[in-house]
């Protein structure tokens, strides 16, 4: 099975925090109309100076991690960390954009907003084709971290192709008492006939693997903890467990975003190669850390769901 395409992080410009000597976005003389300066003000044109043309950007406000990326009936649905109220971090919700070619994107209404359990942190979305959760066949189920003083895992479901969501009345589906368990990435594991969730353990530098028959009731199966000799402390976020075919065998790759202490400066994306039996991920004995990208700010990239063998 070929792995789905990996989407790069869509965080805002952070290079100035790392590369303070020179930044062309700041030092280059302005020759065109600049972007709006007031927080939350919408651009009059998508062609203003410095507007990215390849990477998706919303018309206004704060954006970071891609979330819930799923392919449905010819349309790619990109959800993302979004602040509907301003240009700074906070009020985190799931923004939403759609595309048929992953080049031309149409911004949609905000899909999920903070509720009594907290802000809506990163997560994933699946198509429940066999109605395992009881929300209806082909319901789109979003799985995300409810973030307040504690980070717990919650779900919401959609009956209109991912346009609007209803939060599950039984949330949170995974309870937790601290702020170091987040970013659920979920896929269907055919061999065990269960949904598999990988969860980042933050500053514990590892991940947890959970399983469920129905997306509502979850069992913790194992932990994968790594202590890389000679590496300073860093947090783990946005894990993704991906199968690949290699020399006629299936191998599994775990990618995880770490911050700080990337390969150069700032953040980075590590990967581990190994095997997964439905409960445990076991890494091969390789010279870790291995890096997906050697730039200064590669972060929060994860794979698309429901793309078949692509």
Predicted segment positions?
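Glycine-rich, aromatic-lined ligand/substrate-binding cores of catalytic
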Residues: 300, 309-310
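Beta-rich carbohydrate-recognition and catalytic domains
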Residues: 14-184, 188-236, 245-295, 308-309
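Carbohydrate-binding surfaces of carbohydrate-active enzymes
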Residues: 304-306
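Calcium-binding acidic motifs and repeat modules
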Residues: 5
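C-terminal motif of bacterial Sec signal peptides marking the signal peptidase cleavage site
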Residues: 9-12
């Amino acid at each position: 099975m070929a792995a789905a395409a990996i989407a790069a992080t869509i965080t805002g410009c952070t290079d100035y925090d790392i590369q303070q000597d020179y930044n062309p976005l700041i030092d280059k003389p302005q020759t065109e109309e600049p972007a709006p300066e007031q927080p939350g003000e919408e651009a009059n044109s998508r062609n203003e100076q410095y507007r990215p043309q390849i990477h998706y950007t919303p018309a206004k406000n704060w954006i970071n991690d891609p979330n819930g990326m799923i392919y449905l009936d010819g349309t790619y649905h990109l959800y993302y960390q979004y602040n509907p109220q301003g240009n700074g971090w906070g009020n985190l919700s799931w923004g939403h954009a759609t595309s048929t070619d992953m080049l031309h994107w149409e911004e949609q209404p905000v899909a999920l907003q903070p509720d009594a359990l907290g802000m809506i942190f990163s997560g994933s979305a699946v198509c429940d084709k066999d109605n395992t959760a009881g929300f209806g066949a082909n319901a789109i189920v979003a799985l995300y971290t409810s973030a307040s003083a504690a980070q717990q895992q919650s779900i919401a479901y959609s009956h209109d192709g991912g346009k609007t969501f209803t939060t599950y009345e039984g949330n949170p589906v995974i309870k937790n008492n601290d702020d170091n368990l987040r970013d659920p990435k979920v896929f269907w594991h055919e061999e065990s006939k269960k949904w598999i969730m990988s969860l980042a353990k933050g500053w514990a530098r590892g991940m947890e693997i959970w399983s469920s028959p129905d997306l509502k009731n979850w069992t913790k199966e194992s932990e994968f903890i790594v202590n890389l000799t000679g590496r300073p402390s860093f947090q783990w976020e946005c894990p993704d467990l991906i199968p690949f075919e290699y020399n006629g065998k299936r191998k599994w790759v775990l990618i995880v975003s770490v911050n700080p202490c990337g390969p150069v400066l700032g953040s980075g994306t590590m990967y581990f190669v190994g095997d997964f039996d439905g409960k445990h991920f076991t890494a091969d004995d390789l010279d870790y850390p291995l890096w997906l990208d050697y730039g200064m700010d590669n972060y929060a990239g994860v794979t698309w769901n429901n793309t078949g063998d692509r």
